[in-house]
């Protein structure tokens, strides 16, 4: 038996899970309400299973918006090009400025590490789990990702826990104090020693019977690191303990919208749940009313001479005795009410289209839509999620990169990197979706500098200072781009030396030419000195 744990793990994993589950209950209820109007199967109830037939919402705006928003987040946060970079600290970079070759070699090595990390993410299908995680964040606002430690070249995918499968406790600053995950595993899939211990504790069990396995990750007060262990039927599993650095724990709890003082986050859909509910009720009323209106019912005057039996038996072109006044069709005459409901429904749908970043909401319809219009629309919609990008970059992307760096270094798939000198940075949102934004910044800076050419002869303007301020405003490091005073003087000295050499060579050539043409004998001697024969 393992020794008795202290601190946050004193009561055991299951006890902590049951205690923290009460704090999680309101967030689960809100997540179920949000899933009800979008995609109900994304966050099922505890009583649901694989055979549950979920009720489809009357409107598809929620489901379409959810998928569209998750796809846009996926492309913005995890584009196909490199979405993270490893940079050396500014102090180390300044030290290497005197050695351009050394700086280039460092950048080349860091780029290699970046490619290895990106290839590892692609080869282990991280994108599949990340897309599912983003959908959970939009609906439930919370999700937990677990990155198993790599084992050689084996396939090592990421594992996802829905909000209903884990609990988390944070301090007032949002730092994770402890987490408990619950995995339901068939008894026959457990290792033999664990099966014997479970049967000795709770009696014989069937192979297909489900067993709850709790994994407790908690912050150790003494070491400042995260400790981990697994528990089955109240017993700690031998050999399941682990230790993780505080900044590289493979269990990553993510929030969509963070609120100070709360251990869990709020979902994006929760902010627009009122519009979704209103649209659901309106669409249900409109659809049901449309079905009633589409039912064709004919009314016959009971005192008239027209007989319905003859009308139903008559073929096309037949003549039947009767009067048109005896026949009429039932009409609800609710067009005015329908118009009001349709107008309100369209207005709500337009608002939700903005919220879910649907381009059709603001992009005009036409055969020729300019690229500038598309960029403007994309910028308008991206601004809606500006804060979400910053949260996810700190709670999802940065921890993901740090964990992968630690794991790949431990398995010697990448070289050891000094933590104090190498810093992983994330580029997301409008500012830099991938590295293409760096080129755009550089092009903007060069274009702005080119516009300063007419002011070159103005004695009142300091062009060097204007160029520096333009670069700083755009966000470009001018190290190595703008020449320093020493470099300018050195360059001017080289140019002066080159001009002197060119002028001296020209003067020497003129003197030789004058001397050579002074007499035929001198011309022949000059031609012979350069390998030419006179007269050829």
Swiss-Prot record:
Disulfide bond entries: none
A Pfam family that the UniProt record links to this protein: Head-tail_con
UniProt superkingdom: Viruses
GO BP field: symbiont genome ejection through host cell envelope, short tail mechanism; viral DNA genome packaging
Record has Ribonucleoprotein as a keyword: no
Alphabetical UniProt keywords: Capsid protein, Viral capsid assembly, Viral genome ejection through host cell envelope, Viral genome packaging, Viral penetration into host cytoplasm, Viral release from host cell, Viral short tail ejection system, Virion, Virus entry into host cell
GO cellular component annotations of the record: viral portal complex
Compartment annotation: Virion
InterPro entries linked to this entry: Connector_podovirus (IPR020991), Portal_prot_Caudovirale (IPR038995)
Aminoacyl-tRNA synthetase found in the keyword field: no
Function: Forms the portal vertex of the capsid. This portal plays critical roles in head assembly, genome packaging, neck/tail attachment, and genome ejection. The portal protein multimerizes as a single ring-shaped homododecamer arranged around a central channel.
Subunit structure, interactors included: Homododecamer. Interacts with major capsid protein. Interacts with the tail tube protein gp11. Interacts with the terminase large subunit. Interacts with the internal virion protein gp14.
Family according to the record: Belongs to the podoviridae portal protein family.
The protein's name in its UniProt record: Portal protein
The organism of origin for this protein: Escherichia phage T7
